[in-house]
Amino acid sequence: MRSLKLALLATVAVVGITSAASAADLIIGSEPGPVYDDYASVDWSGPYAGLWVSGQTGSIFGLGANLGVNVLIDKNLLAGAEGSVAWLSDDSWQGQVHGKLGFAAETFAIYGLAGIGVNSITDAYAPVGVGAEVMLADNLSLKAEYQYKWDLDTSADDAHVAKFGFNWHF
């Protein structure tokens, strides 16, 4: 009788341990969660308009507006053209057009630029420089540019220019 009790106790113990070890959550046709992209895709192509402020050698400050267009030639190769007008703190004005070529990533772009400009004091100049732009929202970007304005009449009026502004992309 004692061996029967011992066998019954051993059987209950084995069944109890095995039942607890095999308990698990039941999986019934669960749907996979949503898939998210690791980055936000930005299309730099198309027209844009913007406003900017500038500072240049000789303590001259400017306030300007620009219109431009960008084209993605390849996945990351950006080309564009831009025209701008500005009022300067020395009571002069300037207008310029330039082309740009650079690299566009998901939310930022870097580029080189070159063009031609005129102003009310020194007549003609050639701007060359570099710029960077970062997309802040779907259609709004922040830009920063450095330009060297090479005066085509005299080197005495050459200038270093820093521009900061916003562009609205259509």
Could you say what each language-model-derived stretch is?
Residues 3, 20-170:
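Gram-negative outer-membrane beta-barrel domains
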Residues 9-12, 31-33:
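Short N-terminal leader segment in a subset of presequences, especially plant chloroplast
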Residues 10-11, 18-21:
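Cleavable N-terminal signal peptides
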Residues 12-15, 108-110:
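Alpha-helical transmembrane segments and their juxtamembrane interfaces
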